[in-house]
Amino acid sequence: MEQYVIKGGNPLVGEVEIGGAKNAALAILAAAIMTDEMVYIENLPDVRDINVLLEAIREIGASVERVSPTEVRITGSTIANISVEYEYIKKIRASYYLLGALLGKYKTAEVPLPGGCNIGSRPIDQHLKGFRALGASVDILHGAVVAKAEKLTGKHIFLDMVSVGATINIMMAAAMAEGNTTIENAAREPHVVDVANFLNSMGANIKGAGTDVIRIKGVEKLHGTSYSIIPDQIEAGTFMCAAAATMGDIMVKNVIPKHLEATTAKLEEIGCEVEEFDDAVRVVASKRLKRTHVKTMPYPGYPTDMQPQFTVALTLAEGTSIVTESIFENRFKYADELSRMGANIKVEGNTAIIDGVHKLTGARVSAPDLRAGAALVIAGLAAEGITIVDDIVYIQRGYERFEEKLRCLGAEIEKVSSEKDIQKFQLRVG
């Protein structure tokens, strides 16, 4: 079992290059099998979730050629099986995108119920509602979603709640349906737009992505394409919060600043200086942070995936801050770990009340999920002394070369796999 061992207390300073958006890439990889022609995708993040999904796609018969860690060629003409093995799918929640892709192309799909981070109930009822509206019969049998249709027909679909996954899945299923489909109360996230742009580059007719009403005119078939995935706004936001928490100065490169507006606004609110460039943002924290209130909301509101990282910065801010989580339950499981590092944080339902302290101290902590794991790494970098983060497999699901990028900013962090390695690190850093 690998761990991160960190000696904290130093400001992070320098430049960091952001990779492709994991959440966009997962959906785009699934959508790539919807044509029999070759699809070339670049700016792919080299993270565990991507590798698992590529294995699942290869397992159902598609040709997958990993040109480089950030490039792949996929050809869906050789798919021989519309049933995806549980072995792959139990590891990642985004496996459900194969439902929309397979159903859209073959009018039948069988995909096990998804796994991924344990951050509360994330039902897929809105996905299934959309598939049924398009004319599919959908059952859950032996732990798998089985969807079948004689044909798919466009419909007016109103989502009962804003759901990124459901918006994307319905968009894929409707791309080759007969007639017109309208999705109301659609998610507006940048990766929804990226998936729509990708499908359109394959010949789909999708309009309105990025608004709450998406209109899809079904086409007969999709063709091959070359496509570059947008930068990962959550990875970018994570480094922005790391600058804030460590009193650092980081230039975050290869980003779309508009996608970071909510994070930027909150960092400025707590006293950081944020400078925007065409494809970069610079975050400078030169004085003690100020308190604030933040509530997670669907895009363009403050993202739930940035809540733990920002909370770490607030543990060191002056005064009392309040963080309200309105998207997922159980998203404060990292709070007890922060308390062990000296944070004064109290969780009441979906709200965390944080009384800022002057310093955190290193401790052994465990990552409960992907974003909370990254937040605990930030806490370790800001803390005095040695921090050990266990269960970093969660972090590896969504951050490529995380420790390498942090070291380039001056962090003292290593990935280790034994107590002996930890002792060596402690001796080396004193």
What do the PLM-derived regions correspond to, one by one?
Residues 1-430:
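Short, structured segments at the rim of ligand-binding sites
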